[in-house]
Amino acid sequence: FNCFFDKSNAIDILKNTDIVIDATDNYRSRAIIDNASKKLGIPMIYGGVYRFEGHISVFNYNEGPSFKEIFPDSNEKENDCDTAGILGMLPSIIGNIQALEAIKIIVGIDNNLSGKLLIYNILTHQITKIEL
């Protein structure tokens, strides 16, 4: 597609996909992806990074919650990576976990992050998993 992704074209862009891997960096785009994936019945694999922490979840899948049910409001101005920064390798770690979640869904492995939020701390290598 040779266009900007927005709410006017989200359904058309995503309608022939089986999974959406969110690699965006802002709430507005994630909310648009969430709305479209929910309407189309397509899982959304969310990944977010801020400073030394990354979050991963699978939304709109196996009766799990949507992105906006867990993150109803944006606080982007407070949590801006331009001012707070992130450690450079964190996005690749989070992206790899997102790819793993996509593979698990494709091959039918039920032990995925639907209904859970995985939080990874790059400084301590601590992983916390929260039931949503």
List each model region and its residues.
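Glycine-rich phosphate/adenylate-binding loop
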Residues: 9-19, 23-132
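Conserved SAM/SAH-binding loop
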Residues: 1-10
